[in-house]
Each structure stands twice: as structure tokens, then as C-alpha cells.
């Protein structure tokens, strides 16, 4: 649960089965593991006022991803591209490359350095978006930062793939786990 500490989580809020305000389709709360009371307010800080007739009413909150779904989609796209590069590399190196052999990846896979640099830029953009949502850097970005840093290293020297192929694949797997973890928002 601490994995998404600081990242807003979204809830669809219904009263008696109806969404009283458009904003309640994906109302954001800042995740915190502790119990607390929040006043539901608009962007202007004014509390929402809901007229209720005398009697019993049901208020429900349903987990929804809201704006976070766009980030997840972007990370999934990056994972797909990273896997495509991995498959191209192992066609040449095999899954257990000799770290001392020169596979001449720069010439056999031209443009790979540029692809890796572009994926690094995409991850940087995602990291910046997450920081903007959370207001601070946190645990949620660590996996993304690790992958981005490795991409920066490899984009400058694709020949290093033979030395870091296992960690590259592990970092891709970690991104997949990240997607799974952030998709499951706690209640």
C-alpha cells in the first residue's frame, strides 16, 4: 500500500445510486494509510452541498483509475517497446550473452540507441507527471527512474546490452509489476 503513497487515488461517489456532480465520477483523494475525515470540495475549495430529503440514504465509493489510467497506458506502451527491443537484441546475442564478446549491436541494430533515448524521454515525462500529481518524488517513481537510468546508459552505448541484458529484462518485469501494483488502489 505504501507503494502509492502520495499519489492521488480516485473514487466514483454515488448517493442513492446517482452521481450528484460530474466531478464525483473520479473524485481525487490523496492516499494515506491512516484514517481521516475529508470534506468533498470543488477545485475552488468550496464544499459540495448535496440536498438530502429526510430518511435513509446510501453513499458509495467505487475505485476508479481516473486520470491515472492515462499514465498506466503510457507505461504499458513503453513496456511493449522495451520488450520489442529485448527480442531484437536476443536474436543476436541469445538470452545468455558473453559479456566479453563484441556483438556489434550498433551496426546490426542501427537506430537502437535513438529508440532507447526516446523511451528514456517518455519515462522522464511519466515521472514528471507522477511528481506533479503527488507533489513530491516518492516510492512510486523508483522503478521508472531505474529503467530510465539504464536506458540512458544503453542509448549512449548499445554494446553494453551483452553485460546488462539480465538486469534490462528484470527492469522491464519490474515495470510490469509496477503497473499491476498501481492499478490496484486500496479502499
Residue ranges of model-derived segments:
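Extracytoplasmic
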Residues: 1-186
Amino acid at each position: 500500500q505504501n507503494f502509492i503513497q502520495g499519489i492521488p487515488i480516485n473514487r466514483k461517489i454515488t448517493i442513492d445510486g446517482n452521481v450528484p456532480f460530474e466531478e464525483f465520477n473520479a473524485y481525487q483523494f490523496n492516499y494515506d494509510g491512516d484514517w481521516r475525515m475529508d470534506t468533498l470540495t470543488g477545485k475552488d475549495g468550496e464544499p459540495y452541498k448535496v440536498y438530502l430529503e429526510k430518511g435513509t440514504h446510501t453513499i458509495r465509493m467505487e475505485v476508479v483509475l481516473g486520470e491515472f489510467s492515462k499514465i498506466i497506458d503510457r507505461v504499458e506502451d513503453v513496456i511493449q517497446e522495451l520488450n520489442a527491443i529485448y527480442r531484437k537484441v536476443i536474436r543476436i546475442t541469445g538470452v545468455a550473452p558473453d559479456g566479453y564478446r563484441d556483438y556489434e549491436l550498433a551496426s546490426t541494430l542501427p537506430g537502437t540507441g535513438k529508440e532507447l533515448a526516446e523511451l528514456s524521454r517518455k519515462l522522464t515525462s511519466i515521472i514528471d507527471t507522477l511528481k506533479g500529481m503527488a507533489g513530491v518524488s516518492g516510492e512510486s517513481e523508483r522503478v521508472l527512474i531505474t529503467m530510465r537510468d539504464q536506458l540512458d546508459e544503453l542509448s549512449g552505448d548499445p554494446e553494453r546490452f551483452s553485460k546488462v541484458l539480465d538486469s534490462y529484462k528484470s527492469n522491464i518485469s519490474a515495470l510490469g509489476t509496477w503497473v499491476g501494483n498501481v492499478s490496484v488502489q486500496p479502499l
